[in-house]
UniProtKB/Swiss-Prot annotation:
Region forming the signal peptide: 1-21
Function description: Probable ion channel inhibitor.
Official protein name in the record: U11-theraphotoxin-Hhn1a
Origin: domain of life: Eukaryota
Family: Belongs to the neurotoxin 14 (magi-1) family. 01 (HNTX-16) subfamily.
Keywords noted in UniProt: Disulfide bond, Ion channel impairing toxin, Knottin, Secreted, Signal, Toxin
InterPro entries for this protein: Toxin_22
Organism of origin: Cyriopagopus hainanus (Chinese bird spider)
Propeptide: 22-74
Pfam families named among the record's database cross-references: Toxin_22
Length: 113
């Protein structure tokens, strides 16, 4: 019975002493991993920030192009109905009542001068 107690005590002492060494090693490993994790998070954050900035630049560029191209025309082209009281025909055109084939229409149209 004494040999069992001595063996158990010996195993217990070895486990405790080696466990302490492992605990210190584990603490060191955890510190290294957290430092690496922080650097990885910083890298990932910078990468995400760059992608967002590129996306923002593209969106702003598209908005500026869209605003240039979305300007409405302020004049009416040739052969398009117009209002005789408020003619908005383009330069070189006049708002006139149709002749010949268009006399049955009650509207005015933009024609060349």
């Amino acid at each position: 019975m004494n040999t069992v107690r001595v063996t158990f005590l010996l195993v217990f002492v070895l486990a405790v002493s080696l466990g302490q060494a492992d605990k210190d090693e584990n603490r060191m490993e955890m510190q290294e991993k957290t430092e690496q994790g922080k650097s990885y998070l910083d890298f990932a954050e910078n990468l995400l920030l760059q992608k967002l900035e590129e996306l923002e630049a593209k969106l702003l560029e598209e908005d500026s192009e869209e605003s240039r191209n979305s300007r409405q025309k302020r004049c009416i082209g040739e052969g398009v109905p117009c209002d005789e009281n408020d003619p908005r025909c383009c330069s070189g055109l006049v708002c006139l009542k149709p002749t010949l084939h268009g006399i049955w229409y009650k509207s005015y149209y933009c024609y060349k001068k």
